[in-house]
Design a protein with these regions (language model features):
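Structural motif
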Residues: 8-10, 31
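Conserved beta-hairpin
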Residues: 13-23
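General beta-strand recognition
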Residues: 15, 34-36
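Conserved beta-strand in the GNAT
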Residues: 21-29, 36
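A short, internal acetyl-CoA/4′-phosphopantetheine-binding micro-motif in the GNAT/acyltransferase core
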Residues: 40-47
């Protein structure tokens, strides 16, 4: 089954779902149109499979679609943006 990423605004996080199980989260705090990402986590049995990148990419794509900006406090989100320059325009000034 293909992993799915969904925004769960009640929990202030994006969730990576595999076979109905939450296997990863990218937590955020909303500050107006900006989302601050302080923490990202992938279940240990799913690490090393590109799941973190899928989660962060989908979260950033969703922020872009909504016209928002991001502050990457989480090292993984910061490194993802650094490695993928097409997302640098999302960085809040």
């Amino acid at each position: 089954m293909e992993p799915e990423v969904r925004n769960n605004p009640q929990e202030s996080r994006y969730e990576l779902i595999v076979e109905s199980e939450v296997v990863g989260v990218a937590e955020y705090r909303r500050e107006g149109d900006t989302l601050v990402f302080p923490h990202t986590q992938i279940k240990s049995s799913f690490r090393g499979q590109g799941m973190g990148a899928r989660l962060v990419q989908a979260a950033l794509d969703d922020v872009r679609a909504g016209g928002g900006r991001v502050v990457p406090r989480c090292w993984y989100v910061a490194e993802f943006i650094d490695a993928n320059p097409s997302y640098r325009d999302l960085l809040a000034a």
